[in-house]
């Protein structure tokens, strides 16, 4: 079976072209392929499938084989993959609905992709959470994936894996399915974000839907945007573990964030042939 490996801001994925429907993988097989010690290794696996309404369908799985959610970095990577497969338009369906994208720059194997995300209609502010080791102030939002966002000082030294795992598993307000947990520290000109990812159960180099959630929570919390435009749109520059991304949206009275766009890198890494048991 042929896979292609792509990474978006260090968030890496195995992708297969399944427009003919021939790729059928079990949860255990996906987890085995994504295992970094005994498999190929990736944060997630995606299938590019045919769609009756749009140019293609994105099917996303976490590294543990769970699915049913949107992945922002994965969305940019599957657009880059679709372009490499010869597609010229990028209207597609995902677990959370319709998306569109544009490739706005390319240098070598790296593309810069601008991806339209879902509108975010509301949020929940929790002054504290109920559960062991979960007494933390933060915001819950759904950006295609469930996210909890915390503002913390000293982000570089912060133990986000321990606290992220506690919140993901123990916070009663987020159960029964839990949530990704994001930690933010504003800086002059933007925000820095680190994310504990549910399904990976560890920190990843970046999380696209988490970065979107973090930018919207920053707006709600009064963090000054990096840019403000005449049409009312605002933008935030974001630093992940190593790469920089950008989010822009229109805040409105009716919903929190409308016409949301995530811009960042998507890079081809390798082609891989795998025998599946």
Regions found by a protein language model. Name each.
Residues 1-110, 149-277:
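A glycine-rich beta-to-alpha transition motif near the start of alpha/beta enzyme domains, typified by
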Residues 119-121, 143-147, 266-268:
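Glycine-rich beta-alpha junction loops
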Residues 119-138, 165-167:
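Active-site glycine-rich loop that binds ribose-phosphate moieties when present
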Residues 130-132, 136-158:
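Internal active-site segments that recognize and position negatively charged phosphoryl groups
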């Amino acid at each position: 079976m042929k896979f292609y490996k792509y990474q978006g801001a260090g968030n890496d994925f195995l992708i297969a072209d399944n427009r003919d429907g021939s790729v059928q993988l079990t949860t255990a097989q996906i987890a085995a392929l994504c295992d970094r010690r005994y498999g190929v290794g990736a944060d997630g696996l995606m299938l590019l499938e045919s769609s009756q309404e749009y140019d293609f369908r994105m099917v996303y799985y976490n590294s543990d084989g769970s699915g049913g959610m949107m992945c922002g970095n994965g969305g940019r990577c599957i657009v880059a993959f679709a372009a490499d497969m010869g597609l010229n338009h990028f209207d597609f369906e995902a677990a959370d609905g319709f998306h569109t994208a544009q490739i706005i720059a390319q240098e070598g194997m790296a593309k810069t992709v601008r991806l339209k995300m879902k509108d975010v209609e509301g949020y929940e502010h929790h002054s504290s959470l109920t559960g062991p080791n979960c007494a933390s102030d933060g915001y819950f939002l759904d950006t295609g994936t469930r996210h909890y966002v915390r503002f913390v000082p000293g982000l570089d030294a912060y133990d986000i894996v321990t606290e992220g795992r506690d919140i993901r598993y123990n916070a009663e307000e987020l159960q029964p399915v839990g949530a990704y947990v994001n930690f933010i520290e504003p800086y002059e000109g933007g925000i820095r974000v680190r994310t504990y990812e549910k399904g990976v159960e560890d920190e990843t180099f970046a999380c696209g839907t988490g970065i979107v959630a973090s930018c919207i929570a920053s707006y709600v919390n009064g963090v000054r945007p990096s840019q403000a435009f005449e049409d009312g749109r605002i933008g935030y520059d974001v630093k992940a573990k190593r790469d920089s991304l950008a989010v822009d949206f229109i805040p409105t009275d009716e919903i929190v964030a409308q016409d949301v766009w995530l811009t960042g890198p998507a890079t081809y890494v390798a082609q891989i042939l795998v025998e599946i048991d």
